[in-house]
UniProtKB/Swiss-Prot annotation:
Protein name: Ephrin-B2a
Free-text description of this protein's post-translational modifications in UniProt: Inducible phosphorylation of tyrosine residues in the cytoplasmic domain.
Family: Belongs to the ephrin family.
Record field: compositional bias (Basic and acidic residues): 181-210
Organism in which the protein naturally occurs: Danio rerio
Intervals, Extracellular compartment: 25-225
Gene (UniProt): efnb2a
């Protein structure tokens, strides 16, 4: 009964986890070079990954061993302010180094809320994450900290985790007003900020909030089912272990030898006194009554075995010094 119940709950746990993981997708790989047409001028590449999805950012290999068309980049994950200005700092750690043109180098992004790795990336629903490169594609400009292909080629990735394309842009992350355009800027700044323009439709906002809340509720239900199933399985395992432990202890007690305390005899072999002579000539040993007394703290582990294996009980008599006449009894 317990074994079948354990299998049932284990099956429920596996099914719940499969339902939760079936939503995970492997997104198309992003090739980081200037020939990739997915980078929209003035906007970059906007993605909508969900929790559990995976995506590779690939530094493509140059075919034929030719050095023509070789591009060198360093990719960084930056906050919104650095995305707008296309800047990085010395404290920023590169996410990916594209410095080996003779082989494919890639970095896999796994969109998970909790990472088992101490240095792993963690993503949260409803938040935006940004990847840019301030390198200009050459080895000399590999360590540039400003501009680069982020500004000239709009090579930047905006990842809206756990969101939908119909969701509005959050006003807390993006400004609601913009400075006027200046003709001397040539429209570069305005183009680079096109992705930052908010959607002003109130109906779209309500729809986006509804989709977002429904997806969050669904994922929470699946997670709760996994946790509940795992908890039930752990409880069943604990109960089974306790039951087996009690059963083992009962068997151990049943097979262990049972010891009993023994009784020792305190004997006083005093002759029966006559009326005049005071001797015991002619008296029989059966006329002497020997009192029995339980000896304190006396333990004989062989007593039960002797009395059970050899017929009549055998008593172990302890020799004691003569005692006072008060302990002597006479047969009348």
């Amino acid at each position: 009964m317990g074994d079948s119940l354990w299998r049932y709950y284990f099956g429920v746990l596996v099914i719940a986890c499969k339902v939760n993981l079936s939503r995970a997708l492997i997104l198309d790989s992003i090739y980081w070079n200037t020939t990739n047409t997915k980078f929209v001028p003035g906007q970059g590449l906007v993605l909508y990954p969900q929790i559990g999805d995976k995506m590779d950012i690939v530094c493509p290999r140059v075919e034929g061993g030719s050095m023509e068309g070789v591009e060198y980049y360093k990719l960084y994950m930056v906050p919104l302010e650095q995305l707008k200005s296309c800047q990085v700092t010395k404290a920023d750690t590169p996410l990916l180094n594209c410095v080996k043109p003779d082989q494919d180098v890639k970095f896999t992004l796994k969109f998970q809320e909790f990472s088992p790795n101490l240095w792993g990336l963690e993503f949260f629903r409803g938040k935006d994450y940004y990847i840019i490169s301030t390198s200009n594609g050459t080895m000399e400009g590999l360590d540039n900290q400003e501009g680069g292909v982020c500004k000239t080629k709009s090579m930047k990735i905006i990842m809206k985790v756990g969101q939908n394309p119909s969701d509005p842009i959050s006003p807390k992350d993006y400004p609601t007003s913009y400075p006027p355009k200046h003709p001397d800027l040539g429209g570069k700044d305005s183009k680079s900020n096109e992705v930052l323009k908010p959607d002003a439709s109130p109906h779209g906002e309500d729809k986006g909030d509804g989709n977002k809340s429904s997806s969050v509720i669904g994922s929470e239900v699946a997670l709760f089912a996994c946790i509940a199933s795992a908890s039930v399985i752990v409880i069943i395992i604990i109960i089974m272990l306790v039951f087996l432990l009690l059963k083992y202890r009962r068997r151990h007690r049943k097979h262990s030898p049972q010891h009993a305390t023994t009784l020792s005899l305190s004997t006083l072999a005093t002759p029966k006194r006559g009326g005049s002579g005071g001797n015991n000539n002619g008296s029989e040993p059966s006329d002497i009554i020997i009192p029995l007394r339980t000896a304190d703290s006396v333990f004989c582990p062989h007593y039960e075995k002797v009395s059970g294996d050899y017929g009549h009980p055998v008593y172990i008599v302890q020799e004691m010094p003569p005692q006072s006449p008060a302990n002597i009894y006479y047969k009348v």
